Amino acid sequence: MHHVNKYFNQTMVIEALKMSFYKLNPKQLIKNPIMFVVEVGMILTLILICFPDIFGTSYLSRGYLITIFIILLITILFANFSEAFAEGRGKAQADSLRQAQSNLTARLIEENGAYRIVNATELKAGQNIRVENGETIPADGVVINGLATVDESAITGESAPVIKESGGDFDGVIGGTLVTSDWLEIRVESEAGTSFLDKMIALVEGAERNKTPNEIALFTLLTTLTIIFLVVIVTLYPIASYLHLILPIAMLIALTVCLIPTTIGGLLSAIGIAGMDRVTQFNVLAKSGRAVEVCGDVDVMILDKTGTITYGNRIASEFLPVNQQMLEKLIVAAYMSSIYDDTPEGKSIVRLAKQMYINELPKDIDGTYKTFTAETRMSGIITNEISVFKGAPNSMINLVKQQQGNIPLNIESLCMDVSSKGGTPLIVIENNVMLGVIYLKDVIKDGLVERFTELRKMGIETVMCTGDNALTAATIAKEAGVDRFVAECKPEDKIKVIKDEQAKGHIVAMTGDGTNDAPALAQANIGLAMNSGTISAKEAANLIDLDSNPTKLIEVVKIGKQLLMTRGALTTFSLANDVAKYFAILPALMMSTIPEMTSLNIMHLSSPKSAIISALIFNALIIVALIPIAMKGVKVKGYSIDRIFINNMLIYGLGGLIVPFLGIKLIDMIVQFFV
């Protein structure tokens, strides 16, 4: 969320430092087996400081042991700090959200119409409340009366107020948001503890953050490597005794810490938490870390045309009559079919009709209004004298044919002309007579071509689903740059599209906001629901966009890719580090007893004691150096998967081999004067 950037300050750093010490508790640290091994080594070193000869005679001074102890402690604190700082972001967000719902009261509307002030926690679903200008909405609900602007910045971070009114797509309100003009009467939809704000707090606080399958697999690998290195170190002791080489326990502890994958072990949790945080920064709530991670595996994106590829509010641009004598009749009929249509398209038709018609049009019409449905794909009104409908060409043509009406010869060409321009044609009929076509203009969002090109490079195929005919769909798909399209697609057809792609082994992501989208959102591997959407859609999805911007799916998928690549890059760096440190330290440790090892001491480290201290210091510092990468993620923009893989292998693989040699040598050049 944009409004929590103010929390990245000194206070957060201090809190993270405090948590770093709290996480030294073995009960906390055992969740990270690698760092737990480091802590065990630190405790053993502390015992050696107090009782130097407890494990046999040692030539190491107490000062040297204290140095090892301090470096091991700092290593653990650095690892704890990276995790605590990442967690601190979520806690800062949760605190800001709690402020939005603290000490709220509500103006409850009684059955007799009177008002009663109650505590917001006493509200029950189904009750009606009134909220005036300057008051905070106390609970989630639906506007049943009134029109007002609402400041949702406490939730979304967007400072511009939004208009809320009954009916249409913008009647849902969230508890904790502020009414900044007029008044609203709201039907309560949630009770205390179950509101959207409560769920947000639980999500961003991450109290129940479970490890994702990939994290578990990687942790298993790292734990196995740790055990292998422990076995290697343990076998060194009898070998050293056989060769009459004195290897103090403190040296073996330090060597163990240097060789096990402490770098990635110290950063792994922070990478996962930071990945979820980056999604939150885009005003998207992830219900689990797994949801963000699966985004990284997505290779097919199902995108709605309306609202995702186009701006969503198709605007009535022109009335096209079957002949010019029908123009006035077409305008009046289009107006009548839309007068009770609360959709943006319907309202734009009413506006255009008023602009074009010279005489005054009626404000109210007595009759039965038929709303648009995905099945009928038409809407209109039936009165005692007349029936007027507008709708999709196929639906209207079938309706007229069923009633033995005539189809004008030029109606199809009028529809084709509109479709070829990327618009949406709606045929208008009056008493089963076709009058003409309404041209609804679609406007494609800026910058989509470049973004789709970028996704294509990353190996992601884009599929546009639209209820438009094939000609309109093809025109828009070509202009927007999507890979494929599915025309005349109903909500239930999306499930088939998703299942077909999944049957081919693809990982599918999609967006949706309506109740009819809920099954498809649940079927998709990744479902992004709009905050302005229905409760069922938000429950079915595993991601919720607070800005209700469907194009966010593109950003979320890129963040998921970045999360996986960051984890892979830092794991590669850590393991390459271990290999380099092994060949850097072991020869220096053994060369005093085994002269042949001198030739392998390519770094010319001054002494075994200096080598160990230098490696330990490097081991601690590299965790701090990599925290920014763990938090921000590796760069993935504009590159293909193959290019990113090669770059990461060069930077983090080869770099992971070279950096330890250089770093340890530089530190050794300084340390040799003190050891």
Swiss-Prot record:
Q: Is-annotated flag, keyword Cell membrane?
A: yes
Q: What is its EC number?
A: 7.2.2.6
Catalytic site positions: 304
Q: Subcellular location, in the record's words?
A: Cell membrane
Q: Which reaction does it catalyse?
A: K(+)(out) + ATP + H2O = K(+)(in) + ADP + phosphate + H(+)
Q: Name one GO molecular function term.
A: magnesium ion binding
Q: Does the keyword Transport apply?
A: yes
Q: Which superkingdom is the protein from? A: Bacteria
Provide the transmembrane region boundaries.
34-54, 65-85, 216-236, 245-265, 569-591, 611-631, 644-664
Q: Which PROSITE patterns match?
A: ATPASE_E1_E2
Main subcellular localisation:
membrane
Q: What kind of membrane protein is this, topologically? A: Multi-pass membrane protein
Chain sites annotated for binding Mg(2+): 513, 517
- Positions contributing to ATP binding: 341, 345, 372-379, 390
Q: Which UniProt keywords apply?
A: ATP-binding, Cell membrane, Ion transport, Magnesium, Membrane, Metal-binding, Nucleotide-binding, Phosphoprotein, Potassium, Potassium transport, Translocase, Transmembrane, Transmembrane helix, Transport
GO cellular component terms listed in the entry, alphabetical order? plasma membrane
NCBIfam families documented for this protein:
ATPase_P-type, kdpB
Q: What does this protein do?
A: Part of the high-affinity ATP-driven potassium transport (or Kdp) system, which catalyzes the hydrolysis of ATP coupled with the electrogenic transport of potassium into the cytoplasm. This subunit is responsible for energy coupling to the transport system and for the release of the potassium ions to the cytoplasm.
Family per UniProt?
Belongs to the cation transport ATPase (P-type) (TC 3.A.3) family. Type IA subfamily.
Q: Which PANTHER family match?
A: POTASSIUM-TRANSPORTING ATPASE ATP-BINDING SUBUNIT
Instruction: Tell me the subunit arrangement.
Output: The system is composed of three essential subunits: KdpA, KdpB and KdpC.
This protein is called what? Potassium-transporting ATPase ATP-binding subunit
